[in-house]
């Protein structure tokens, strides 16, 4: 009898792709991420017993665990095929423990790319779980839990409820805050430039030459008077070409993508957030349905700091380049890239799994975002294996009365890799365009047409963008490939940092929290300290350090800082100043301030109580518009009927004046940071109370949840959309008195009537007609009973109120624990 094998991966998409490559003897199932973790309700780390973590099955996954146990029991071998990194290794380790697998039965396999060849080879060469890799993840998890659960409550008490601190996120906020302080402290310095428009009389072509200096020394004019002196000193002296230099300049292609550089370039070129970039990259890695090919993993593993490319991939790129572009576009020798200092180099760089699957060829099978990101990865990889671009560079030295001017031009002579790809720049400034020069010769005279003196001022350092913050984190050793995107998302979600256009700046809240952290917990926000912690985690992964040694070394100083902070801040509460906006009050003209209320942040006049004007504040939400891929924005309005505020979510292009960009997507459902594992679109959750599990709203997806199954209270057909919005977002807010009374009357008796109907249903087989009739009778009975028995109605009302109060008390006690759990990954 043939042996039966079970393969466990994280997601259904990955399971589908791998299942296609394995035979009928293999059953592939998804764990849907972690199945066991530290509990949410408490610290989950036994500090008294040497920091022993207390793991437990994740609530809500009991059925899945039972299903996997059953499948594992009936299988001869269980292949744990989670992602090839620390987190993936830990998931496999937890699975092995949960499913009670011994070393003989449990086999660990990893796939750097999900192709038939790699999957087949990996299954043939399984290995044991790498305990060093698991321990590195445990150390990181326990460190983050200790910092998050013990430091966050202090922020709640001393600053504001709902705050959190983290080992990496707090450093990232400080980096943004420090940059803002640099900008505020910057003092601009005046300087001038002088250009001369010169004409070659032979060709009658005019070009621009830039002032360099005098008598071979560089001069940088500091004032307009100095420029005037230079012009006066030159007077009517002639301009003569004294030196011509012609060279071929070669430019090498960019390195292949790592996680960090992919996130940076996707931010610059595609306007994708780091989180969105990783979500789309995950889809491309796990597999996409391609016409004629089936489900195909399109790229290699996307969490990597390696620049290494396999020899097989280099050979495939060479064949493709020679076939499409010709011999001149391939370098004399194949390009191999060295690993950067500190890189773990466990995987290859990010590249297409099959370079022959061009973006244009599979465009019809991909979503817009998948296509753009795949094209970026494919182009960058191919360019990294191509010949240099060659530029014809000409520079001229021009003298006039001892004063020196320079003119230069650079023209593309051979496109090389630029035929496929060119890297974007971080800043907004455009590269200086060098115009063409006429055919100049040494000794020839030139005619002066005019001078162009220009005043300039030195500029402060630019604020960070998503891309430059990630680059700075990588350069300073803050975090690892798996933490860059979650960290940027976390500091934005916590409102420690906000986006001003594409630039990041600290909020007053971020400044206050960072100030507190710098004063009381200097190690937590110190870049060098955090970088050393990352290095220690790397030594755990390498098997050189025991993971609990890392925790012990850290905890002594942290516990001392925590105790000192509690004493020093006893009885104190730090005030967060209002953030002044550029919006003017429509009533009195003052600059409005940003405040937080029950419906979130809003703009208010600082002249309260004499001026009570307020207006909504548009806030960017996680996720993308399912219609056009634009950003989702949180907007508010006020009901004309009830004069109450309601919230809805719309595409950023809903107010666009450009008809080509305008998008009419809007919803009452709240967009989440999660993507549907089936179709890849942003998932949403119900506004207000109850049913908080994210769901897919894509009708074409098998995971689609219809509107009537999302937990909303069904409204009367005559109710306006505006009223529906109000109740959807503020289901827990007070409705009008009349509505409250009616709702209570109906609810009080509906419960009893429903039970009666239920009993009747058990004994009698009902048809659709009988069901409808029963519902009609129930409503009528409830209404009559509510009208006839006001005493019972009042009792029901009191009971409901008592329960609600008790629930609120319970919630308040556990709220801090829940929020503290949300530390960075």
Question: Where are the model-predicted features located?
Answer:
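C-terminal helical "lid" subdomain and adjoining coupling/linker elements of P-loop NTPases
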Residues: 158-162, 177-223, 269
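Core structural elements
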Residues: 140-151, 168, 198-200, 249-261, ...
């Amino acid at each position: 009898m043939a042996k039966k094998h079970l393969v466990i991966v994280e997601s259904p998409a990955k399971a589908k792709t791998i299942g296609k490559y394995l035979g009928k003897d293999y059953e592939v199932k998804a764990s849907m991420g972690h199945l066991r973790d530290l509990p949410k309700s408490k610290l989950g780390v036994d500090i008294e017993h040497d920091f022993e973590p207390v793991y437990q099955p994740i609530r809500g996954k009991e059925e899945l665990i039972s299903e996997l146990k059953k499948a594992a029991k009936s299988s001869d071998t269980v292949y744990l095929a989670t992602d090839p990194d620390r987190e993936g290794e830990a998931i496999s380790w937890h699975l092995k423990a949960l499913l009670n697998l011994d070393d003989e039965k449990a086999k660990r396999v990893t796939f750097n790319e999900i192709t038939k060849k790699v999957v087949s080879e990996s299954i043939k060469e399984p290995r044991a779980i790498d305990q060093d890799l698991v321990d590195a993840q445990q150390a990181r998890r326990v460190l983050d839990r200790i910092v998050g659960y013990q430091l966050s409550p202090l922020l709640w008490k001393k600053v504001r409820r709902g705050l959190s601190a983290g080992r990496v996120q707090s450093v990232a906020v400080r980096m943004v805050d420090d940059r803002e302080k640099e900008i505020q402290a910057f003092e601009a310095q005046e300087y001038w430039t002088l250009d001369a428009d010169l004409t070659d009389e032979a060709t009658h072509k005019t070009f621009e030459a830039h002032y360099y200096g005098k008598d071979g020394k560089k001069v940088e004019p500091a004032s307009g008077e100095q420029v005037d002196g230079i012009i006066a000193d030159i007077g009517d002296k002639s301009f003569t070409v004294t030196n011509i230099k012609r060279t071929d300049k070669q430019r090498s292609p960019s390195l292949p993508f790592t996680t960090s550089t992919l996130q940076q370039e996707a931010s610059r070129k595609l306007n994708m957030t780091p989180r969105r970039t990783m979500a789309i990259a995950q889809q491309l890695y796990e597999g996409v349905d391609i016409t004629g090919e089936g489900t195909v993993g399109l790229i290699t593993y996307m969490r990597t700091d390696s620049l290494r490319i396999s020899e097989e991939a280099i050979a495939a790129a060479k064949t493709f380049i020679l076939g499409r572009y010709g011999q001149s576009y391939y370098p004399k020798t194949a390009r191999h890239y060295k690993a950067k200092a500190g890189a773990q180099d466990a995987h290859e760089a990010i590249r297409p799994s099959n370079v022959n699957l061009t973006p244009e060829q599979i465009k019809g099978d991909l979503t817009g975002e998948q296509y753009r990101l795949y094209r970026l990865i494919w182009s960058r990889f191919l360019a990294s294996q191509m010949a240099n671009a060659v530029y014809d560079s000409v520079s001229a030295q021009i003298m006039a009365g001892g004063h020196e001017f320079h003119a230069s031009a650079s023209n593309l002579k051979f496109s090389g890799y630029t035929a496929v790809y060119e890297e974007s720049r971080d800043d907004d400034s455009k590269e200086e365009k060098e115009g063409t020069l006429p055919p100049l010769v040494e000794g020839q005279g030139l005619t002066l047409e005019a001078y162009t003196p220009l005043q300039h001022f030195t500029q402060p350092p630019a604020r960070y963008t998503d891309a430059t913050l990630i680059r700075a984190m990588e350069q300073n050793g803050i975090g690892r490939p798996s933490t860059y995107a979650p960290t940027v998302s976390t500091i934005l979600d916590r409102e420690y940092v906000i986006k001003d256009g594409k630039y990041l700046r600290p909020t007053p809240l971020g400044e206050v929290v960072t100030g507190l952290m710098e004063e009381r917990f200097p190690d937590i926000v110190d870049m060098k300290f955090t970088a050393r912690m990352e290095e220690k985690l790397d030594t755990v992964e390498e098997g050189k350090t025991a993971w609990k040694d890392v925790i012990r070394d850290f905890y002594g100083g942290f516990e001392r800082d925590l105790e000192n902070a509690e004493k020093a801040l006893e009885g104190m509460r730090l005030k967060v100043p209002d953030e002044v906006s550029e919006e003017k009050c429509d009533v009195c003209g003052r600059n409005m301030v940003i405040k937080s209320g029950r419906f979130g942040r809003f703009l208010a006049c600082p002249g309260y109580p004499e001026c009570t004007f307020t207006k909504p504040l548009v806030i960017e939400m996680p996720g993308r518009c399912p219609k056009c891929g634009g950003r989702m924005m949180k907007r508010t309005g006020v009901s004309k009927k009830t004069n109450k505020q309601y919230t809805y979510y719309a595409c950023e292009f809903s107010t666009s004046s450009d008809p080509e960009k305008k998008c009419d997507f809007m919803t009452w459902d709240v967009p989440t940071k999660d993507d549907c594992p089936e179709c890849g679109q942003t998932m949403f959750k119900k506004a207000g109370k109850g049913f908080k599990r994210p769901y897919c709203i894509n009708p074409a997806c098998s995971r689609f949840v219809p509107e009537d199954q999302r937990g909303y209270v069904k409204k009367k057909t005559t109710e306006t959309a505006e009223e529906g919005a109000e109740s959807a977002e503020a289901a827990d807010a007070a409705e009008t008195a009349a509505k409250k009374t009616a709702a209570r009357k109906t609810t009080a008796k509906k419960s009893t009537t429903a039970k009666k109907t239920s009993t009747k249903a058990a004994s009698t087989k009902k048809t659709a007609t009988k069901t409808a009739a029963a519902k009609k009778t129930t409503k009528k009975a409830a209404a009559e009973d509510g009208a006839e028995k006001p005493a019972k109605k009042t009792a029901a009302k009191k009971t409901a109120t008592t329960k609600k109060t008790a629930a609120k008390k319970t919630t308040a006690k556990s709220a801090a624990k829940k929020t503290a759990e949300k530390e960075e990954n």
